[in-house]
Amino acid sequence: MNPDLQKERAGASFNPELLTNVLDGSPENTRRRREIENLILNDPDFQHENLNFLSRSQRYEVAVKKSAIMVQKMRKFGIADPAEIMWFKKLHLVNFVEPVGLNYSMFIPTLLNQGTTAQQEKWLHSSKGLEIIGTYAQTEMGHGTHLRGLETTATYDPETQEFILNSPTVTSIKWWPGGLGKTSNHAIVLAQLFTQGKCYGLHAFIVPIRELGTHKPLPGITVGDIGPKFGYDEMDNGYLKMDNYRIPRENMLMKHAQVKPDGTYVKPLNNKLTYGTMVFIRSFLVGESARSLSKACTIAVRYSAVRHQSEINPGEPEPQILDYQTQQYKLFPLLATAYAFQFVGAYMKETYLRINEDIGHGDLSELPELHALTAGLKAFTSWTTNTAIEACRMACGGHGYSHCSGLPNIYVTFTPTCTFEGENTVMMLQTARFLMKSYDQVHSGKLVCGMVSYLNDLPSQRIQPQQVAVWPTMVDINSPDSLTEAYKLRAARLVEIAAKNLQTEVIHRKSKEVAWNLTSIDLVRASEAHCHYVVVKLFTEKVLQIQEKSIQAVLRRLCLLYSLYGISQNAGDFLQGSIMTESQITQVNGRIKELLTAIRPDAVALVDAFDFQDVTLGSVLGRYDGNVYENLFEWAKKSPLNKTEVHESYKHLKSLQSKL
């Protein structure tokens, strides 16, 4: 064990195990998660060579092999709970993506949300055991987030009671679905439904694409892999072209909308119900942001405690780089953000499950806010995490650039989150639509509830300098509750600015669509401010729920740092709205420095509490034992280029040196 890490752990103010229990939800959840992790980590069937040293084709084959073993093991161990399945799936390939991932994250949830009981009975069991391997084919070459622009058609033929699927243009070819290229034999295809001469918009269809037994593409289906990408080497993201391809009427998912045998269309109770899978996956992605950022912080903080460099006091030993204030300023706000997102992710999961249950009972009242919240928080957390992972990599200096650090892989695996399941700017604009509707409701005399209830105060308060001039004296920069109020005022102010600018443009332009585009920068800023407020509010509420004093104390420091750092980075908003004064912003910056010093002794313990095992972390720099340099050398020696002392390519250089 590295003596620096021993010293760090001995000097912590709290027991990391207690904080791990908080993150997992309970001590029992921690015990069970570790039990499942150990089933994999101690199983020789799941051991494999370092994927960094394999070709893309080899990496894909390893991933498929491990996925097949995973299903067999889940049956053997009786793992059926959705949360436990998720834990098991995350570990069997460690830090790499799995080709069958969309079968579990998109295909099965869509079947559950949009399929009838009969359809679930037909396909669900087979898909859980990978007899049917499904993917989710929504995105096309020409359209992604703009769902109404999708061009794939499904035309109903009442004579044969079949749908005829077509990819009428090059841009209508399905493009990007994970597992589509080589792995899947079925796809849930999103297509424009035509029946009785009319288009009824996007609907979901179960489409067999490969023959069971031979795995060959079926007649009328053209399918393949789209080629190498920035990351995701193990994933066969694919394309799908359909030419007059027929499927039975029963293959349309009909829990909500239906097409009768004669072609009569029965519309759903609520059009938003068909977007259930997207809402589910976006709520899940908030937790993924937290997990990826927590990994990056663990690596960067541990390495910063092990690495010694330069000098603070001349003649003294080189200090740990974690002792430099600039390193703390790079990493500790990100560590605080990781904890904030952990709690927001747990909240989103609980909220989705609760509202989904209400929807099942016919109560759709909270669906609009759930849609807006999942869209906005998906964008807010993934944008932040994407930038933060790269900041962690650069905080590790040159070694962070090596794949041995684990950070490049975390980055390239996470960064697609900013564009898949809804491009982030568009997601923010979807949240903005909900905010504008809520603003209009308030101004028509109605009250709004949920996370936007702060807008109810607008008509009486008006976010204007002369009427909130007393506010600065009320801000307590040491009170998470007071800071939450400051974020609330900022959100209200930016929502009102966006709404007023939108109204002005509507009057001038006469077109709501053009006005929306010309106000879109303000609308995105309003959504970001709303999401930032939600994160601060949820973090603050979580801290108050903690009973153990040592845990509450360290989380309170992180909560304060997260809130104050956000104010520092967005000082203009707080100053322009007269929410805070210039002297208070100066105090905020001073308090941030104090918090860096206060968090420093607990930094290693805080990342230990995330409880990532070394195999899960996949990093030489972030090893639990801190023995970085010895293992860095061992890792390098495994490079395939080192299998020979003289590489075969030397023949090209030898002729140039023959005259020397």
Swiss-Prot record:
InterPro entries: ACO, ACOX_C_alpha1, Acyl-CoA_ox_N, Acyl-CoA_Oxase/DH_mid-dom, Acyl-CoA_Oxase/DH_mid-dom_sf, Acyl-CoA_oxidase, Acyl-CoA_oxidase_C, AcylCo_DH-like_C
Entries under CDD domains matching the protein: AXO (cd01150)
Pathway(s) this gene product operates in, as recorded in its UniProt entry: Lipid metabolism; peroxisomal fatty acid beta-oxidation
Binding residues for FAD: T139, G178
Motif Microbody targeting signal: where in chain: 658-660
Taxonomic lineage: Eukaryota, Metazoa, Chordata, Craniata, Vertebrata
EC number: 1.3.3.6
A GO MF term: protein homodimerization activity
Alphabetical list of Gene3D superfamilies matching this protein: Acyl-CoA dehydrogenase/oxidase, N-terminal domain, Butyryl-CoA Dehydrogenase, subunit A, domain 2, Butyryl-CoA Dehydrogenase, subunit A, domain 3
Cofactors named for this entry: FAD
Function, in words: Involved in the initial and rate-limiting step of peroxisomal beta-oxidation of straight-chain saturated and unsaturated very-long-chain fatty acids. Catalyzes the desaturation of fatty acyl-CoAs such as palmitoyl-CoA (hexadecanoyl-CoA) to 2-trans-enoyl-CoAs ((2E)-enoyl-CoAs) such as (2E)-hexadecenoyl-CoA, and donates electrons directly to molecular oxygen (O(2)), thereby producing hydrogen peroxide (H(2)O(2)).
Family: Belongs to the acyl-CoA oxidase family.
Gene Ontology biological process: fatty acid beta-oxidation using acyl-CoA oxidase; fatty acid catabolic process; fatty acid oxidation; generation of precursor metabolites and energy; hydrogen peroxide biosynthetic process; lipid metabolic process; prostaglandin metabolic process; very long-chain fatty acid beta-oxidation
Disulfide pairings: none
Alphabetically ordered keywords of this record: Acetylation, FAD, Fatty acid metabolism, Flavoprotein, Lipid metabolism, Oxidoreductase, Peroxisome, Phosphoprotein
Official protein name in the record: Peroxisomal acyl-coenzyme A oxidase 1
